């Protein structure tokens, strides 16, 4: 239930803020850096402060902890889903937009009947990959350290925390089985039917979808009275949402309010930027007063070490899983086989595997510093793989036919056809992987298995240690340092890549 509520809030957030970012440049200049920034903020940074907020909001009630867990699921899904929806809204083919305008669609109908529909396949795929981050967040949020004690909610997360503390390997295996069962049920009852249904929204020849099989639950709904009743209900809701509400809106003359407000765009832009600057100055001053100053001299070295591990993990993930994702995505049969397997592996929290790595390191006297790189990859590689598969699946059939006509092979096939076609999805994948990488770095640089603790020097280790000790000022300093690294990545890496993806690699 916590997972589903978090997913619902993530979808609502994605639609609202993706549309605002795609439509209004002043908002886009703030929303995109903010979302990229928040995506890479470590989960413990949210939990440290949101836990206190929700506990004070609902004193003497378990509702505060429930809200913390739901918000943790939200932070694991919302940023990735919003970025995907924004990306697809920006690359809607011009001929489709011109066709919608020729049918005299109003802006409301144009969004829901064209732009949102065009974005649904990619959004659904990223909702599936975001599921892994959501489970990671949910597991972490069901057992939260507060000071010298741990507050737990009933659930798989608290069960895993107890199993790790007791070094109980069978209990960890039971938790893996329970998570796998949940993921398989979601795949069979929700995601597979939705993937099959939304295949009709891909921008290509309808004959390209014939290779897709019909999942058993999709067939059950399609040929049942329940499915027919559900279809009638959805059609009635669509008629209300797409036609009756816009007619009421225009009948009441509410559209004139937007025209009136548009006349003062310069004023709203000025007030918006002024508000953003004042908020940044105020929060920056409060944080500076809150930070412990004795750690400043050591932060650059810690930041450099953790950044090197994260960068190495991300580059290896792209180099290894881009070819693998292309191989899977080109074959619908392989997608059908590997999709549930990848979902199960992706949704299993990486820290479950860390005790096995810790045992290996202890036995063979290895250095945790280098071993942290493959451990970080466990939390990043699935983002790249899912986005590459989504990108390959979304390539229009016409583009594929052109590449076959020119006889592209091997290196030329990658350079002139495949990599340009999936480049926007690779960009989304590595940005999403960055968020998972920073979270994984915190968990990977300090491993605890019962009474045994292994650690590597780095910013992630500092954040993990001070958070477990309940030192909020030190935790805030570590999270702020990690956020500074993220901000540098946004300015010098992610934004240039976004511009290239939007201008050079777009279907027109």
Where are these regions (language model features)?
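Short cytoplasmic-facing helical segments at TM-TM junctions of multi-pass membrane proteins
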Residues: 84-123, 127, 387-428, 463
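Generic hydrophobic transmembrane alpha-helix motif, especially the helices
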Residues: 36-76, 343-380
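Periplasmic/extracellular loop-to-transmembrane helix junction in inner-membrane transport proteins
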Residues: 1-8, 165, 243-316, 331
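Glycine-rich helix-loop "coupling/hinge" segments at transmembrane-helix boundaries
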Residues: 136-169, 203, 439-476, 481-482, ...
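Transmembrane-helix bundle segments that line or gate the permeation/cavity pathway
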Residues: 72, 76-92, 98, 119-211, ...
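Transmembrane-helix boundary motif in ABC transporter permease subunits
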Residues: 5-35, 312-342, 355
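Transmembrane alpha-helices
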Residues: 107-141, 174, 178, 190, ...
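C-terminal transmembrane helix and the adjacent membrane-cytosol boundary/short C-terminal tail
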Residues: 25, 173-249, 332-334, 472-508
């Amino acid at each position: 239930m916590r997972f589903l509520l978090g997913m619902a809030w993530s979808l609502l957030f994605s639609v609202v803020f993706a549309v605002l970012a795609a439509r209004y440049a002043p908002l886009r200049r703030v929303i995109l850096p903010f979302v990229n920034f928040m995506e890479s903020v470590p989960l413990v940074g949210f939990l440290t402060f949101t836990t206190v907020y929700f506990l004070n909001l609902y004193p003497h009630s378990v509702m505060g902890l429930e809200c913390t867990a739901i918000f943790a699921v939200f932070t694991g899904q919302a940023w990735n889903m919003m970025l995907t929806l924004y990306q697809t809204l920006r690359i809607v083919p011009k001929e489709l937009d011109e066709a919608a305008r020729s049918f005299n669609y109003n802006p409301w109908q144009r969004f829901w009947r064209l732009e949102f529909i065009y974005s649904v396949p990619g959004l659904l795929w990223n909702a599936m990959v975001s599921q892994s981050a959501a489970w990671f967040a949910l597991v972490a949020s069901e057992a939260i350290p507060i000071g010298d004690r741990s507050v737990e909610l009933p659930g798989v997360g608290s069960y895993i925390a107890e199993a790790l503390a007791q070094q109980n390997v069978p209990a960890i295996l039971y938790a893996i089985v329970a998570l796998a069962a949940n993921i398989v049920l979601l795949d069979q009852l929700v995601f597979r039917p939705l993937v099959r249904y939304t295949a009709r929204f891909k921008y290509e020849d309808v004959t390209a979808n014939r290779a897709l099989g019909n999942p058993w639950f999709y067939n059950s709904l399609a040929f049942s009275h329940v499915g027919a009743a559900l279809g009638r209900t959805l059609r009635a809701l669509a008629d209300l949402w797409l036609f009756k509400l816009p007619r009421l809106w225009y009948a009441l003359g509410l559209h004139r309010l937007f025209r009136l407000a548009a006349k003062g765009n310069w004023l709203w832009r000025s007030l918006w930027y002024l508000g953003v600057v004042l908020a940044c100055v105020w929060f920056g001053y409060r944080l500076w007063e809150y930070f412990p100053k004795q750690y400043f001299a050591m932060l650059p070295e810690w930041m450099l070490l953790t950044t090197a591990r994260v960068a190495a993990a991300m580059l290896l993930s792209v180099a290894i899983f881009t070819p693998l994702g292309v191989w899977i995505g080109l074959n619908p049969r392989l997608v059908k086989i590997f999709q549930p397997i990848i979902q199960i592996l992706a949704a299993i929290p990486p820290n479950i595997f860390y005790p096995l790595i810790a045992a290996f390191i202890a036995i063979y006297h290895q250095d945790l510093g280098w071993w942290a790189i493959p451990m970080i990859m466990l939390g990043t590689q699935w983002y790249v793989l899912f986005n590459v598969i989504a990108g390959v699946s979304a390539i229009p059939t016409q583009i594929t036919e052109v590449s076959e006509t020119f006889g592209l092979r091997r290196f030329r096939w990658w350079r002139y056809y495949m990599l340009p076609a999936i480049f926007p999805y690779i960009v989304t994948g590595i940005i999403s992987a960055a968020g998972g990488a920073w979270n994984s770095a915190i968990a990977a640089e300090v491993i605890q298995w019962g009474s045994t603790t292994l650690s590597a020097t780095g910013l992630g280790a500092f954040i993990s240690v001070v958070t477990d000790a309940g030192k909020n000022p030190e935790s805030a300093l570590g999270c702020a340092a990690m956020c500074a690294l993220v901000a540098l990545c946004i300015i010098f890496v992610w934004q240039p890549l976004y511009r290239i993806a939007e201008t050079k690699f777009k279907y027109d």
